Design a protein with these regions (language model features):
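Short, membrane-interfacial amphipathic segments enriched in basic
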Residues: 1-10, 215-222, 273-285
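Terminal transmembrane helical anchor/hairpin motif
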Residues: 5, 41-74, 201-256, 260, ...
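Selective transmembrane-helix segments that form parts of the transport pathway or gating/packing helices
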Residues: 19-27, 125-152, 299
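Pore- or pathway-lining transmembrane helices of multi-pass membrane proteins that form conduits
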Residues: 25-29, 192-209
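Alpha-helical transmembrane segments of multi-pass membrane transporters/translocases
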Residues: 26-30, 231-284, 294-310
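Long, hydrophobic alpha-helical segments
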Residues: 82-107, 147
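Transmembrane helix boundary and interhelical loop/hinge segments in multi-pass membrane proteins
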Residues: 99-121
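Secretory targeting signals
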Residues: 134-189
Length: 314
Protein backbone atom coordinates (compact mmCIF):
# COMPACT_ATOMS: atom_id res chain seq x y z
CA UNK A 1 0.00 0.00 0.00
CA UNK A 2 2.78 2.45 0.91
CA UNK A 3 4.35 2.11 -2.54
CA UNK A 4 1.27 3.81 -4.00
CA UNK A 5 2.27 7.00 -2.19
CA UNK A 6 6.06 6.85 -2.55
CA UNK A 7 7.74 10.30 -2.41
CA UNK A 8 4.46 12.14 -1.91
CA UNK A 9 6.25 14.58 0.40
CA UNK A 10 8.87 15.41 -2.22
CA UNK A 11 6.18 16.01 -4.83
CA UNK A 12 4.31 18.25 -2.39
CA UNK A 13 7.43 20.34 -1.87
CA UNK A 14 7.86 20.53 -5.65
CA UNK A 15 4.28 21.81 -6.03
CA UNK A 16 4.97 24.40 -3.34
CA UNK A 17 8.02 25.58 -5.23
CA UNK A 18 6.06 25.88 -8.46
CA UNK A 19 3.45 27.97 -6.63
CA UNK A 20 5.76 30.01 -4.41
CA UNK A 21 4.20 33.18 -5.85
CA UNK A 22 0.72 32.09 -6.92
CA UNK A 23 -0.48 30.58 -3.63
CA UNK A 24 0.78 33.44 -1.41
CA UNK A 25 -0.90 35.97 -3.74
CA UNK A 26 -4.20 34.12 -3.42
CA UNK A 27 -3.91 33.86 0.37
CA UNK A 28 -2.90 37.49 0.89
CA UNK A 29 -5.64 38.73 -1.44
CA UNK A 30 -8.44 36.75 0.21
CA UNK A 31 -7.30 37.40 3.78
CA UNK A 32 -6.56 41.11 3.35
CA UNK A 33 -9.83 41.73 1.51
CA UNK A 34 -11.83 39.94 4.23
CA UNK A 35 -10.14 41.82 7.07
CA UNK A 36 -10.47 45.12 5.22
CA UNK A 37 -14.23 44.68 4.85
CA UNK A 38 -14.48 43.58 8.47
CA UNK A 39 -12.76 46.79 9.53
CA UNK A 40 -14.80 49.04 7.21
CA UNK A 41 -18.35 47.91 8.01
CA UNK A 42 -18.45 49.21 11.62
CA UNK A 43 -17.27 52.60 10.36
CA UNK A 44 -19.85 52.68 7.57
CA UNK A 45 -22.72 51.73 9.91
CA UNK A 46 -21.67 52.94 13.37
CA UNK A 47 -25.11 53.12 14.99
CA UNK A 48 -27.67 50.42 15.73
CA UNK A 49 -30.29 52.37 13.76
CA UNK A 50 -28.17 52.28 10.60
CA UNK A 51 -27.50 48.57 11.07
CA UNK A 52 -31.20 47.86 11.51
CA UNK A 53 -31.88 49.72 8.27
CA UNK A 54 -29.40 47.41 6.56
CA UNK A 55 -31.10 44.43 8.20
CA UNK A 56 -34.34 45.42 6.51
CA UNK A 57 -32.68 45.04 3.10
CA UNK A 58 -32.12 41.34 3.78
CA UNK A 59 -35.87 40.85 3.71
CA UNK A 60 -35.77 41.69 0.00
CA UNK A 61 -35.84 38.41 -2.00
CA UNK A 62 -33.30 39.78 -4.51
CA UNK A 63 -30.80 40.51 -1.74
CA UNK A 64 -31.48 37.14 -0.13
CA UNK A 65 -30.80 35.46 -3.49
CA UNK A 66 -27.46 37.26 -3.75
CA UNK A 67 -26.05 36.94 -0.22
CA UNK A 68 -28.18 34.37 1.60
CA UNK A 69 -30.74 34.48 4.41
CA UNK A 70 -30.42 36.91 7.29
CA UNK A 71 -29.89 35.84 10.89
CA UNK A 72 -30.00 37.86 14.09
CA UNK A 73 -31.91 40.66 12.38
CA UNK A 74 -33.61 41.78 15.58
CA UNK A 75 -30.25 42.81 17.01
CA UNK A 76 -28.14 43.30 13.90
CA UNK A 77 -24.50 43.43 14.99
CA UNK A 78 -21.36 44.24 13.02
CA UNK A 79 -20.38 40.57 13.03
CA UNK A 80 -23.75 39.40 11.71
CA UNK A 81 -23.63 42.02 8.95
CA UNK A 82 -20.09 40.99 8.03
CA UNK A 83 -21.09 37.33 7.73
CA UNK A 84 -24.30 38.04 5.80
CA UNK A 85 -22.75 40.23 3.15
CA UNK A 86 -19.34 38.60 2.78
CA UNK A 87 -19.35 34.88 3.61
CA UNK A 88 -21.11 33.68 0.44
CA UNK A 89 -19.01 35.79 -1.93
CA UNK A 90 -15.76 34.97 -0.18
CA UNK A 91 -16.65 31.27 -0.22
CA UNK A 92 -17.15 31.47 -3.99
CA UNK A 93 -13.76 33.18 -4.37
CA UNK A 94 -12.07 30.48 -2.30
CA UNK A 95 -13.84 27.89 -4.44
CA UNK A 96 -12.47 29.50 -7.61
CA UNK A 97 -8.95 29.45 -6.18
CA UNK A 98 -9.18 25.75 -5.35
CA UNK A 99 -10.66 24.83 -8.73
CA UNK A 100 -7.88 26.55 -10.66
CA UNK A 101 -5.02 25.31 -8.47
CA UNK A 102 -6.28 21.73 -8.26
CA UNK A 103 -6.94 21.48 -12.00
CA UNK A 104 -3.44 22.78 -12.71
CA UNK A 105 -1.76 20.05 -10.67
CA UNK A 106 -4.01 17.17 -11.70
CA UNK A 107 -5.48 17.05 -15.19
CA UNK A 108 -3.32 19.84 -16.68
CA UNK A 109 -0.10 18.19 -15.50
CA UNK A 110 -1.35 14.90 -16.91
CA UNK A 111 -2.42 16.48 -20.20
CA UNK A 112 0.99 18.11 -20.68
CA UNK A 113 2.90 14.92 -19.87
CA UNK A 114 4.29 16.04 -16.51
CA UNK A 115 2.62 13.19 -14.60
CA UNK A 116 4.04 10.66 -17.07
CA UNK A 117 7.52 12.04 -16.47
CA UNK A 118 7.03 11.94 -12.69
CA UNK A 119 5.81 8.33 -12.85
CA UNK A 120 8.99 7.36 -14.69
CA UNK A 121 10.83 8.33 -11.50
CA UNK A 122 10.57 6.54 -8.11
CA UNK A 123 7.12 7.94 -7.30
CA UNK A 124 3.92 6.11 -6.41
CA UNK A 125 1.04 6.15 -8.92
CA UNK A 126 -1.19 8.01 -6.43
CA UNK A 127 1.54 10.36 -5.21
CA UNK A 128 0.90 13.27 -7.64
CA UNK A 129 -2.82 13.46 -6.83
CA UNK A 130 -2.22 13.03 -3.10
CA UNK A 131 0.50 15.70 -3.10
CA UNK A 132 -1.81 18.15 -4.88
CA UNK A 133 -4.58 17.53 -2.33
CA UNK A 134 -2.12 17.88 0.54
CA UNK A 135 -0.91 21.29 -0.63
CA UNK A 136 -4.47 22.54 -1.19
CA UNK A 137 -5.52 21.34 2.27
CA UNK A 138 -2.59 23.20 3.82
CA UNK A 139 -3.46 26.30 1.78
CA UNK A 140 -7.06 26.23 2.99
CA UNK A 141 -6.02 25.67 6.59
CA UNK A 142 -3.76 28.74 6.34
CA UNK A 143 -6.70 30.76 4.99
CA UNK A 144 -8.86 29.44 7.84
CA UNK A 145 -6.40 30.47 10.55
CA UNK A 146 -5.30 33.81 9.11
CA UNK A 147 -8.87 34.93 8.40
CA UNK A 148 -10.05 33.81 11.84
CA UNK A 149 -7.35 35.52 13.87
CA UNK A 150 -7.25 38.49 11.52
CA UNK A 151 -10.94 39.21 12.07
CA UNK A 152 -10.63 38.64 15.82
CA UNK A 153 -7.69 41.05 15.97
CA UNK A 154 -9.98 43.89 14.82
CA UNK A 155 -11.22 44.04 18.39
CA UNK A 156 -14.95 44.53 17.74
CA UNK A 157 -17.24 43.11 20.40
CA UNK A 158 -19.54 41.26 18.02
CA UNK A 159 -16.65 39.83 15.97
CA UNK A 160 -15.56 37.46 18.72
CA UNK A 161 -13.07 34.59 18.66
CA UNK A 162 -15.65 31.80 18.37
CA UNK A 163 -17.44 33.41 15.44
CA UNK A 164 -14.17 34.34 13.74
CA UNK A 165 -12.89 30.76 14.00
CA UNK A 166 -16.14 29.51 12.48
CA UNK A 167 -15.97 32.12 9.69
CA UNK A 168 -12.44 31.01 8.80
CA UNK A 169 -13.33 27.33 9.12
CA UNK A 170 -16.29 27.81 6.77
CA UNK A 171 -13.98 29.22 4.10
CA UNK A 172 -11.43 26.47 4.65
CA UNK A 173 -14.09 23.75 4.46
CA UNK A 174 -15.63 25.06 1.25
CA UNK A 175 -12.15 25.36 -0.25
CA UNK A 176 -11.30 21.75 0.60
CA UNK A 177 -14.64 20.66 -0.85
CA UNK A 178 -14.01 22.31 -4.23
CA UNK A 179 -10.45 20.99 -4.31
CA UNK A 180 -11.74 17.45 -3.77
CA UNK A 181 -14.54 18.00 -6.30
CA UNK A 182 -12.11 19.26 -8.95
CA UNK A 183 -9.80 16.32 -8.28
CA UNK A 184 -12.79 14.03 -8.78
CA UNK A 185 -13.74 15.69 -12.08
CA UNK A 186 -10.09 15.46 -13.16
CA UNK A 187 -10.46 11.67 -13.10
CA UNK A 188 -13.68 11.71 -15.13
CA UNK A 189 -12.56 14.07 -17.91
CA UNK A 190 -9.77 13.77 -20.46
CA UNK A 191 -8.50 17.36 -20.59
CA UNK A 192 -7.97 20.33 -18.32
CA UNK A 193 -10.57 22.50 -20.04
CA UNK A 194 -13.29 19.96 -19.31
CA UNK A 195 -12.15 19.60 -15.70
CA UNK A 196 -12.38 23.35 -15.13
CA UNK A 197 -15.64 23.54 -17.08
CA UNK A 198 -17.36 20.87 -15.00
CA UNK A 199 -16.02 22.36 -11.77
CA UNK A 200 -17.14 25.89 -12.57
CA UNK A 201 -20.44 24.56 -13.84
CA UNK A 202 -21.01 22.90 -10.48
CA UNK A 203 -20.01 26.11 -8.67
CA UNK A 204 -22.50 28.17 -10.67
CA UNK A 205 -25.29 25.63 -10.19
CA UNK A 206 -24.53 25.47 -6.47
CA UNK A 207 -24.75 29.25 -6.20
CA UNK A 208 -28.04 29.44 -8.13
CA UNK A 209 -29.53 26.53 -6.18
CA UNK A 210 -28.55 28.24 -2.94
CA UNK A 211 -30.16 31.48 -4.07
CA UNK A 212 -33.42 29.83 -5.10
CA UNK A 213 -33.44 27.72 -1.96
CA UNK A 214 -32.88 30.71 0.31
CA UNK A 215 -35.84 32.46 -1.27
CA UNK A 216 -38.30 29.59 -1.80
CA UNK A 217 -37.18 26.11 -0.72
CA UNK A 218 -34.57 25.50 1.98
CA UNK A 219 -33.98 21.91 0.82
CA UNK A 220 -32.19 23.28 -2.26
CA UNK A 221 -29.95 25.37 -0.02
CA UNK A 222 -29.04 22.39 2.13
CA UNK A 223 -28.13 20.36 -0.96
CA UNK A 224 -25.86 23.14 -2.21
CA UNK A 225 -22.45 23.28 -0.46
CA UNK A 226 -22.65 27.09 -0.56
CA UNK A 227 -26.10 27.05 1.01
CA UNK A 228 -25.04 24.51 3.61
CA UNK A 229 -22.05 26.57 4.72
CA UNK A 230 -24.28 29.63 5.26
CA UNK A 231 -26.25 27.60 7.83
CA UNK A 232 -23.34 28.12 10.21
CA UNK A 233 -25.04 31.43 11.12
CA UNK A 234 -21.65 32.94 11.94
CA UNK A 235 -21.54 35.54 14.75
CA UNK A 236 -25.18 34.74 15.63
CA UNK A 237 -25.64 31.07 16.59
CA UNK A 238 -22.25 29.69 15.43
CA UNK A 239 -23.31 26.22 14.26
CA UNK A 240 -20.35 23.96 13.43
CA UNK A 241 -22.25 21.03 11.92
CA UNK A 242 -22.30 22.44 8.35
CA UNK A 243 -18.49 22.63 8.42
CA UNK A 244 -18.23 19.02 9.60
CA UNK A 245 -20.68 17.82 6.92
CA UNK A 246 -18.79 19.71 4.20
CA UNK A 247 -15.45 18.24 5.28
CA UNK A 248 -17.02 14.76 5.46
CA UNK A 249 -18.32 15.00 1.90
CA UNK A 250 -14.89 16.26 0.82
CA UNK A 251 -13.25 13.16 2.30
CA UNK A 252 -15.64 10.95 0.30
CA UNK A 253 -14.88 12.85 -2.92
CA UNK A 254 -11.16 12.61 -2.23
CA UNK A 255 -11.45 8.85 -1.72
CA UNK A 256 -13.41 8.48 -4.96
CA UNK A 257 -10.81 10.52 -6.84
CA UNK A 258 -8.01 8.30 -5.54
CA UNK A 259 -9.92 5.15 -6.47
CA UNK A 260 -10.70 6.35 -10.00
CA UNK A 261 -7.11 7.47 -10.42
CA UNK A 262 -5.91 4.00 -9.46
CA UNK A 263 -8.13 2.10 -11.94
CA UNK A 264 -7.87 4.26 -15.07
CA UNK A 265 -5.05 4.50 -17.60
CA UNK A 266 -2.82 7.56 -17.65
CA UNK A 267 -4.26 10.20 -19.97
CA UNK A 268 -7.71 8.62 -20.10
CA UNK A 269 -11.00 9.57 -18.49
CA UNK A 270 -14.45 8.14 -17.89
CA UNK A 271 -16.38 10.80 -19.81
CA UNK A 272 -15.67 10.53 -23.56
CA UNK A 273 -14.56 13.67 -25.35
CA UNK A 274 -16.88 14.92 -28.07
CA UNK A 275 -15.30 15.09 -31.53
CA UNK A 276 -14.26 18.55 -32.60
CA UNK A 277 -15.36 20.45 -35.69
CA UNK A 278 -14.02 19.32 -39.03
CA UNK A 279 -13.11 22.92 -39.89
CA UNK A 280 -11.86 25.69 -37.63
CA UNK A 281 -13.46 29.10 -37.37
CA UNK A 282 -12.06 32.00 -39.38
CA UNK A 283 -11.58 33.69 -36.01
CA UNK A 284 -8.81 31.17 -35.22
CA UNK A 285 -6.71 32.22 -38.21
CA UNK A 286 -5.36 35.27 -36.37
CA UNK A 287 -2.87 35.09 -33.46
CA UNK A 288 -5.26 37.08 -31.25
CA UNK A 289 -8.21 34.83 -32.03
CA UNK A 290 -6.19 31.68 -31.39
CA UNK A 291 -4.86 33.05 -28.09
CA UNK A 292 -8.36 33.98 -26.92
CA UNK A 293 -9.63 30.53 -27.87
CA UNK A 294 -6.87 28.76 -25.96
CA UNK A 295 -7.32 30.97 -22.89
CA UNK A 296 -11.12 30.98 -23.01
CA UNK A 297 -11.68 28.98 -19.84
CA UNK A 298 -9.25 30.95 -17.59
CA UNK A 299 -10.67 34.24 -18.93
CA UNK A 300 -14.23 33.18 -18.15
CA UNK A 301 -13.13 32.04 -14.70
CA UNK A 302 -11.49 35.37 -13.92
CA UNK A 303 -14.48 37.33 -15.25
CA UNK A 304 -16.77 35.37 -12.93
CA UNK A 305 -14.41 35.96 -10.03
CA UNK A 306 -14.14 39.69 -10.67
CA UNK A 307 -17.90 39.98 -11.10
CA UNK A 308 -18.46 38.34 -7.72
CA UNK A 309 -15.83 40.60 -6.18
CA UNK A 310 -17.56 43.66 -7.66
CA UNK A 311 -20.95 42.53 -6.39
CA UNK A 312 -19.52 42.06 -2.91
CA UNK A 313 -18.32 45.67 -2.95
CA UNK A 314 -21.82 46.60 -3.69
Amino acid sequence: MSRLYTNTGKLARFILRRNRIRIPVWIVSIVSFTIMIGAMLPELYPTSIERQMMAETLKNPAVTFMVGPGYGLDNYTDGAMMAHYMLAFTAVTVGIMNILLTATHTREDEEYGRIEMIRSLPAGPLSPLTAAFLILIITNVIIFLTVAFGLYSLGFESIDLGGSLLYGASLGAIGIFFSALTGFFAQLTTNNRSTIGYSFGFLIIAYIARGIGDVENEILSLISPLGLILRTQVYVNNYWWPVLVTVGVSVVLFGLALYLNSVRDLGSGFIPTKPGRSKGSVFLSSPLGLSLRLQRTPIIAWVIGMFILGVSYG
